[in-house]
Amino acid sequence: MKIMLVRDRNVLNNNWLAYFANLLHERGHEVVIACDTYGKLGVSAPGHELEPGVRLANVNGKTSSPLQNFWRRIRCKALPSWHLFDRLIKAEKPDVIICYFPVDLYNVTRFQHHNIPIVQMVHGYPPMILDKVLHKNPLSRAFCRQSFARINTWQVLMNSYKKEIDPFFAPQNVVRIANPVKQYAENEMVDLSAEKKRIIYVARIEKKTKRPHLLVEAFAKIAAEFPDWKVEIWGMRKYPEYEKEINDFIRAHNLTGQVALMGYTEDVEGLYRRADIHAFPSASEGFSLAIADAMSIGLPHVGFKDAHSVNEIIVDGHNGFLADNVDDFAAKLKILMKDKELRIKFGYNAHEDMKAYAPEILMNQWEELFQKLCPANPDTKK
């Protein structure tokens, strides 16, 4: 079966997209990643390169012609690309189109008349991804609605998200397929018996959703009791004013030697192995691979009870704790910091819980979906 994955830009630096495309390819599918970018293709991280059999089709990519590049640079910024995707779809003739974001759906539907089944992914809490469409002007909403009507299946990451798509989008078929999670044998798990006295948070350093400042505030309440413990926040740094707020708080509360913003790293697994606790104060997630991967390797977690997805992956009192507020977050951290055996217990439970998201299981669910969308295709694996 030929599958077209569509994401308009920042393709190569999306580790999950590369992983998913490679898994499809390993199962015998022909995979084409279609994008529309002149200067934002991205760079693959080591270990996350596309397999040689996965093809990349960039409708606005650079060429060897300076004149053509000048035109493509203008076209990419100023003009829609629907006709370019229409041409690509006619040439490739995919069996299924999978759209990463709503903008990708527009690119493969507007002023196009193909009847290829379309799967729309929702990589987050649906209202956060989709509700911005509801605030567009009436004409724009009408155009958007025409595109959304072309969707055969919506794919969400949590069961609770099935009911969170607004009726405006008229979702007819919504399935839950979570992200596949890397699996570790028991002898590959993090060694929590060797105490590192380190709490980590792996997420981009951003205020509205990821909220690392809440972890810093929580730790400040108990730091004096645990002078040997450290908090490290690892993730992409794009907001210097927000970082200044956090660093000012760190200095004001004499936490300079205990709390640090560490920035981006490609060795995330190494971070997990050097930690005792993964604290995750995010307000909302789709299906956080940062949580899932850390659980799979055996780390206990602390999150917030009102955080979408976080409050389903973290099971309170089983593989971690869920907190009501910052004070409670601090209290839950304190319990785990004082009790190594509890950390080991929660970490093992987390490791076991992630077996339900093994790549083989999740990719079988995708195969079942493809079978429903293209029942006559002999290449669809049952």
What are these regions (language model features)?
Residues C99-L105, V122:
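Short His-centered aromatic/hydrophobic patch
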Residues N14-Y19, K197, E206-K221, V231, ...:
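A conserved mid-protein helix/loop that constitutes part of the nucleotide-sugar donor-binding site
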